[in-house]
């Protein structure tokens, strides 16, 4: 005789498995008050994350404590309003910042760029932890990191100009991702082989969703280190390099 089928989980049980807004219920033709207030709060947190200040000095001190020579630069975006209205300015170095890079160590394997992006709070919360886990992994395979560059008003492509100025074979950009309603502090890592102005997203690999409820700093560093090593060996990133790093995460229990 066959054993009885396992009953399906209730919607309430499913809700505990995801921060996504599912099975919220209703009150008449609208949402219940609790769900509506929760949505409003999440939206406010996402907006605050975009407009939060970026403490480049604090990030610089944290990276220097890890033994990394660290420089500070800015994009051509004069302020946050400029940054949001003119994405193109966030992809270009401000002239005096270019002069800062001209005096830095050249011809390195990897240049690390930490940029505020669209969520400075994500950078403050996650970036140093990712770097802390990443450095020994790169050192273990004899991949050198020259300097870390902390960039204010940064878009992802700013790393291309920074990497080119440093003569780096590859650039790794850790940057705040666009805040979501369930993840206002998510960090992304973008890797580009042969960085230079004019490259597109097709030339990059991305490790995204790095935050407390997503990919951990250790897991992200594992993936980044694998992509860096393989990218340098194959002399390619982006669509030419598939992430086959595997996972450090434990397997989910079988139902």
UniProtKB/Swiss-Prot annotation:
Which residues are listed for adenosylcob(III)alamin binding in this entry?
Answer: 156, 177, 206
Where does the protein principally reside?
A: other
Which Gene Ontology terms cover its molecular function? cobalamin binding; ethanolamine ammonia-lyase activity
* Pfam families per UniProt: EutC
The protein's required cofactor(s) are namely: adenosylcob(III)alamin
Q: Where does this one sit in the cell? A: Bacterial microcompartment
Lyase found in the keyword field: yes
Q: Enzyme class, one word? A: lyase
> What does the UniProt keyword field contain?
Bacterial microcompartment, Cobalamin, Cobalt, Lyase
Q: How is the cofactor bound?
A: Binds between the large and small subunits.
The keyword Protein transport is assigned to this record: no
Q: Name one GO biological process term.
A: amino acid metabolic process
Q: How does it assemble?
A: The basic unit is a heterodimer which dimerizes to form tetramers. The heterotetramers trimerize; 6 large subunits form a core ring with 6 small subunits projecting outwards.
Q: Which HAMAP family match?
A: EutC
In its UniProt entry, what is this protein called? Ethanolamine ammonia-lyase small subunit
Q: Which organism is it from?
A: Rhodopseudomonas palustris (strain TIE-1)
């Amino acid at each position: 005789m066959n054993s009885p089928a396992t009953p399906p989980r209730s919607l309430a049980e499913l809700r505990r498995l995801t921060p996504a807004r599912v099975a919220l219920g209703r009150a008449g033709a609208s949402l219940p008050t609790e769900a509506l207030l929760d949505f409003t709060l999440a939206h406010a947190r996402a907006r605050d994350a975009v407009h939060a200040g970026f403490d480049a000095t604090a990030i610089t001190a944290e990276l220097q404590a890890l033994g990394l020579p660290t420089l500070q630069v800015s994009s051509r975006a004069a302020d946050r309003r400029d940054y949001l209205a003119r994405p193109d300015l966030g992809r270009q170095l401000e002239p005096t910042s270019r002069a800062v890079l001209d005096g830095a160590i050249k011809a390195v394997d990897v240049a690390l760029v930490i940029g505020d992006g669209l969520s400075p709070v994500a950078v403050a919360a996650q970036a140093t932890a990712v770097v802390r886990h990443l450095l020994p992994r790169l050192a273990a395979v004899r991949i050198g990191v020259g300097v870390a560059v902390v960039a204010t008003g940064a878009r992802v492509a700013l790393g291309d100009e920074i990497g080119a100025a440093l003569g780096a074979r590859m650039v790794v950009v850790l940057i705040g991702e666009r805040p979501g309603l369930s993840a206002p502090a998510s960090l992304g890592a973008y890797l580009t082989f042969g960085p230079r102005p004019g490259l597109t997203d097709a030339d990059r690999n991305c490790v995204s969703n790095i935050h407390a409820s997503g990919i951990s700093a250790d897991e992200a560093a594992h993936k980044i280190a694998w992509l860096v090593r393989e990218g340098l060996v194959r002399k390619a990133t982006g669509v030419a390099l598939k992430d086959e790093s595997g996972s450090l995460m434990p397997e989910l229990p079988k139902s």
